[in-house]
Regions:
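Acidic-and-aromatic substrate-binding clefts and catalytic sites of carbohydrate-active enzymes
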Residues: 13-20, 42-55, 81-84, 120-125, ...
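N-terminal pre-domain/capping segments
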Residues: 1-106, 110, 128, 138, ...
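Acidic/histidine-rich catalytic cores of soluble enzymes
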Residues: 3-4, 8, 37, 135-244, ...
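Active-site cleft segment of glycoside hydrolase catalytic domains centered on the general acid/base Glu
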Residues: 122-137
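A short, acidic, flexible beta-alpha connecting loop/helix-capping segment that sits on the rim
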Residues: 264-282
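Active-site groove signature of glycoside hydrolases
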Residues: 105-126, 147-156
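H/E-rich (His + Asp/Glu) clusters that bind or coordinate divalent metals
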Residues: 250, 262-263
Length: 310
């Protein structure tokens, strides 16, 4: 691992939590003791509409002055969006957006930009969607290369969300400036083997984003039968040492696979304990302790069958 970062989405108000300005967030990450920051590349944080060269220079100085060196940019893309209207050049819009993010990354001294693939469109053949993503990532990587920046594909959106497909995708793009940003939480929630996936993707991965969860069952009451209908389980974000994802095993396997990148902590869904600034800070500080002190969470095998959301 090459540095522990805090993701600014954690303090963006995205799910009802307190909102910090980007400057306030930089100070928060530094005060908590993080090595760097992962910056949400949209309002209310690092929007390309608001950050030109002068603004980026000021922000970079603030990050440096607070003793942090590592920066990763969190982009937001969906290359399969609105395929039903090919007259609108959405793919071009997004590639141009990534090019602008590459400029921002260069100005901030960041080496990588997180990107997403696409959500499945039921009305469009899968192969067409896959090919659109491959060609888009390849062109985006060309643009990023002009600024000596790497784009990293996170396993977040529907397409290539499983580890094998993510590996296939990055290999098919076949570009030095397109890598993986493989996370453990998605395959863990899918009930997949995160250790074998980590060994397979470790060398291709430049950054990973971390959160831990506990799975809560859900039911709907059916008065007609005086009983309950089981619904898909709910993933509750919890402190790192209380979740079911075995991060010590994950990072060990990532290292065996060749991972040497950065790690960011995100609070991107409602937290156990509520949406207060104090609770956010407590979770973030707990992540640092968990990672730096090598805290290994106890494994409760009794709940093993509940780990998957399938």
């Amino acid at each position: 691992m090459n540095g522990l970062l805090l993701h600014s989405v954690s303090y963006s108000g995205s799910w009802g939590q307190p909102i910090l300005t980007l400057d306030e967030f930089i100070d928060k990450a530094a005060d908590l003791g993080f090595d760097g920051v992962m910056l949400m590349a949209k309002r209310p944080h690092l929007s390309v509409l608001d950050y030109g060269p002068r603004e980026c220079a000021r922000l970079r100085q603030r990050i440096t002055d607070r003793g942090m060196q590592k920066v990763c940019i969190a982009g937001y893309t969906n290359f399969t969006g609105d395929l039903a209207h090919p007259d609108i050049p959405n793919r071009e819009f997004q590639i141009r957006h990534i090019a602008e993010l590459a400029r921002v990354a260069h100005d901030l001294g960041a080496g990588s930009i997180r990107v997403f693939t696409g959500y499945l469109e039921a009305s469009t053949p899968f192969q067409r969607q896959w090919d659109t993503i491959v060609s888009s990532l390849r062109e985006a990587a060309d643009r990023a290369a002009e600024f000596d920046v790497v784009i990293g594909v996170q396993n977040h959106h529907d397409i290539a969300v499983d580890p094998d497909s993510l590996h296939d995708l990055v290999r098919e793009v076949n570009h030095h400036h397109c890598r993986a940003m493989f996370d453990a939480w998605a395959p863990a929630l899918q009930g997949l083997d995160i250790e074998s996936a980590a060994r397979k993707l470790g060398a291709l991965t430049v950054h990973t984003t971390v959160a831990n969860y506990s799975v809560r069952p859900q039911f709907r009451y059916l008065s007609s039968v005086v009983n309950y209908e089981r619904l898909p389980a709910r993933a509750q974000a919890v402190p790192m040492d209380e979740g079911f994802i075995d991060y010590p095993a994950f990072f060990k396997a990532m290292g065996e696979g060749g991972f040497e990148g950065t790690v960011a902590y995100e609070m991107c869904s409602p937290l156990l304990g509520g949406a207060t600034l104090e609770n956010l800070d407590r979770h973030a500080a707990g992540f640092l302790q968990y990672m730096r002190l090598g805290v290994v969470p106890p494994r409760d095998v009794r709940d093993k069958d509940q780990f998957s959301l399938r």
